[in-house]
């Protein structure tokens, strides 16, 4: 259901996101990112091909939902989602990464009507499933090493002042400095405690309750797209009578073939190693890199870490008409308004647009910015000049004034 919902949300912008007529043609993607995974979406840039692959992914997700040939359906979802996500990686959030990684482990778990013995067997897949979920919270906590998290406890002040994500409730909560300090300490404490509570069966229910409270609180304060629903759905796999995580006592022997068990134990070692390597900035040996690329298990979880970041702002696509008037192409042709928006939500039609635009500013790829400007100007015959502007409103320390600063990312003149 989670995959189907995510696919449905993309339908209005399928051509803009994934076709060669959209914001990231295949040639442009290959110029800014190395290809690391066999990709069906790169075979054609037509909207028809993209739609067919979208339908195939939805079919595999529906088969998985109905329990029909679950293992094959899960493998198809894993492969097709990797293909889709690679086609435009600037659209993704942490929830998409968790979804793909958990699908890998689910391919080796009894998702359909297996016998109770098989469901409760001791398997490296159950170990990997639990380890994967726990590592997300553990390394997200470890990454938060900046003093604003550990000593000053002002991190959530910076997080909730990122208006691209902040909800109306966040605008109200961030006004209290005391609340910010308490919530910062509480958030960090939850991220540290959840992975350990989930690991042992005696404390797992407490861990799941805290995980639920943690993510519902995040959803109330921040618009983070697939992150919250994905985390909650993946946590269902830790409930009793679902694919069960390992205990300290050995269970029924696993029925997976020996080579598969060896592969899964290697994958368990890899996901732990790569999280440490990313955190410590280690040089990863080529054989280890190759293993991660083949099975697409590379990951890192620096969510609002080590510092939550101060960058904030909004986009303006200024189009100057031939009569000299200026309009904002991103706001449907309204007059250009340089004032700070009262509500940032309408500036981002969806979470994928939010991710795309923020990555556009963070990565500063001139060719991508130029392509986006040209795409935004398509069909406009009345323009003389256009420019893509990011109004950077860097969040100052508490008590200091905000100073918006326009930055031009791309511009274009049109011939008469």
Model-assigned labels for residue ranges:
Residues 1-416:
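Alpha-helical membrane-anchoring segments
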